[in-house]
Amino acid sequence: MSAPIGATRAERWTLLAIGVASFELVAGALWIQLAWQEDPCPLCIIQRYLFLLIALFTFVAAAGGRRVALLRVLSLTTALAGAAVAVRHIYVQAHPGFSCGFDALQPVIDSLPPAHWLPPVFKVGGLCETLYPPILGLSLPMWALVGFSAIAVALGWRIRAQAVIRTA
């Protein structure tokens, strides 16, 4: 008996949950930005892009088709890249003094098309070294690291489960 080409029902629900969680994390960041007046830095914006990219990959994978395995791997790679950006952000906040009121990433991030289409969402307004009050004891980059790590674990688990199914 051959293994199914597309995603199983359980995998589709997992992929949908990951996509929704990614959107919710970006929505939470926007709420913090607008309600608490905490401007996002370039690394925050990069993390938003990566969460949205994960959502895109997982939603397309959940829709099915022949490229589910590729989309799973792309989602996992994006989550790992997001975790790396979050770790860098945590490091910058732990070692302030890298910038002199200007972040070298700002012009690059602000020149991307989404920054022109949706400035409140993708426009840089703060510095990466700025510390905001923690939420439940963790800074925002730490929460992003938790989110990216949880997504990576869930995707890794699904990839492993799918590999076991195919070898059986």
Swiss-Prot record:
GO biological process terms, semicolon-separated: protein folding
Cellular compartment(s): Cell inner membrane
A Pfam family hit: DsbB
Disulfide pattern: C41-C44, C100-C128
Gene3D superfamilies, per database record: DsbB-like
Cytoplasmic-side segments: 1-14, 65-69, 162-168
Membrane side Periplasmic: residue ranges: 32-49, 88-142
Keyword annotations: Cell inner membrane, Cell membrane, Chaperone, Disulfide bond, Electron transport, Membrane, Oxidoreductase, Redox-active center, Transmembrane, Transmembrane helix, Transport
Segments traversing the membrane: 15-31, 50-64, 70-87, 143-161
A molecular function GO annotation: electron transfer activity
Any single Gene Ontology cellular-component annotation: plasma membrane
Mode of membrane association: Multi-pass membrane protein
Function of the molecule: Required for disulfide bond formation in some periplasmic proteins. Acts by oxidizing the DsbA protein.
Similarity comment: Belongs to the DsbB family.
Protein name: Disulfide bond formation protein B 2
Species this protein is from: Burkholderia lata (strain ATCC 17760 / DSM 23089 / LMG 22485 / NCIMB 9086 / R18194 / 383)
Encoding gene, per UniProt annotation: dsbB2
